[in-house]
From Swiss-Prot:
The chain crosses the membrane at residues 20-40, 44-64, 89-109, 123-143, 215-235, 244-264, 267-287, 301-321, 322-342. It is a multi-pass membrane protein. One of its GO terms (cellular component) is plasma membrane. Belongs to the NqrB/RnfD family. This is Ion-translocating oxidoreductase complex subunit D. The complex is composed of six subunits: RnfA, RnfB, RnfC, RnfD, RnfE and RnfG. The modification FMN phosphoryl threonine is found at T187. Part of a membrane-bound complex that couples electron transfer with translocation of ions across the membrane. Keywords: Cell inner membrane, Cell membrane, Electron transport, Flavoprotein, FMN, Membrane, Phosphoprotein, Translocase, Transmembrane, Transmembrane helix, Transport. Pfam families: NQR2_RnfD_RnfE (PF03116). Its main location: membrane.
Length: 351
């Protein structure tokens, strides 16, 4: 009888990179379906466009670097970056913005640092921030949720306006953004901040049609609940750990609740922070990126809490309506320092 001699390790682990990436993409589906239901097919088209661009950009870059293209693309990391980017962008953002952000995320933020596992910053958020700084008007132009739309936008309408700038009937993005009251639509966070700075009270702001069914804005609470469900799925599968999402959400809720209790006439209610914008997407899918996040348990708690604090500060005092992307990138800068001071004590050594 012949015996096969194999070298260690002899343990088996199903958590391969390819499988992890696919699980994260699968976990995004509940939030994506909520986006489609309340805001139309735009984000679905953006995800498809970003995915095609990401695979082409990664393939070309790998070929230039003399890497095995097919093997490397099979890890699905480029696909996940594209999905997260497509989810984050406004549904009807022009096609060239999607391509530009994806190329920047894959080539500049990932491959120029050495590829998967070498990048210090989250590639999807780098691409998003490049667009937000360069094209702030387009990046804050969101469709009203379906119940408030005066001009219904179907799949064909969304596809045409993304590539041409207007629907087949000749409607522009600015016309589509007006809700049933004739008011130009923005995200709930943007609307609340702008209205508050114009002198309105929180009570009067929350009487607007956007907030009629929920403090977090029509549709937005279900989008966030969808990503929460996906995040819990990842936790149960052991794909991510609880430290970053929990500390992120607790830190954000603590800051929002404390400020709201002290001065409710000046600050947004906690539920608006919790279930609006990219809160759950950021907590479970973006901040938990194992490459750019802290690697120790104590470090993860600090990292998540720092992001929650930064999100609240940017949303409250910053010039942009949602601060998740900036908060994650700023926290990425601190990861080496956090890991240095939270590294566990080696056995047999005092420190």
């Amino acid at each position: 009888m012949a015996f096969r001699i194999a070298s260690s390790p002899f343990t088996h682990n199903q958590q391969r990179t390819q499988r992890i990436m696919l699980l994260v993409i699968l976990a995004c589906l509940p939030g994506m379906l909520a986006q489609v239901y309340f805001f139309g097919y735009g984000n679905l088209i953006q995800v498809g466009l970003a995915s095609a661009t990401a695979l082409i950009a990664e393939g070309v870059t790998l070929s230039l670097r003399k890497f095995a293209v097919r093997t490397t693309l099979a890890d699905n990391s480029a696909l996940l970056t594209a999905v997260l980017l497509g989810i984050s962008l406004p549904p009807l953002a022009p096609w060239w913005m999607v391509v530009m952000a994806t190329v920047f995320a894959i080539i500049i933020a990932k491959q120029l640092y050495g590829g998967l596992g070498q990048n210090p910053f989250n590639p999807a958020m780098i691409g998003y921030v490049v667009l937000l700084i360069s094209f702030p008007v387009q990046m804050t132009s969101w469709l009203p949720p379906v119940p408030l739309q005066t001009i219904p936008v179907g799949f064909h309408d969304a596809l045409v306006i993304i590539f041409t700038g207007h629907t087949p009937d000749g409607y522009t993005m600015q016309q589509l953004m007006h809700n049933v009251d004739g008011i130009s639509q923005a995200t709930p966070l943007d609307t609340f901040k702008t209205s508050l700075r114009s002198g309105q009270t929180p009570q009067s702001i929350l009487q607007q049609p956007m907030f009629a069914q929920s403090l977090s804005g029509i549709g937005w609470q279900w989008v966030n609940i969808g990503f929460l469900i996906g995040g819990l799925f990842l936790l149960m599968r052991g794909t991510i750990r609880w430290h970053i999402p929990v500390s992120f959400l607790l830190s954000l809720m603590f800051c929002a609740s404390l400020s709201w209790v002290i001065a409710p006439e000046k600050f947004a209610p906690p539920m608006l922070h919790l279930l609006s914008g990219a809160t759950m997407l950021g907590a479970f899918f973006i901040a938990t990126d194992p490459v750019t996040a802290s690697t120790t348990n104590r470090g993860r708690l600090i990292f998540g809490a720092l992001i929650g604090l930064l999100v609240w500060l940017i949303r409250t005092y910053g010039g942009y309506p949602d601060g998740v992307a900036f908060a994650v990138l700023l926290a990425n800068i601190t990861v080496p320092l956090i890991d240095y001071y939270t590294k566990p004590r080696a056995y047999g050594h005092r420190r």
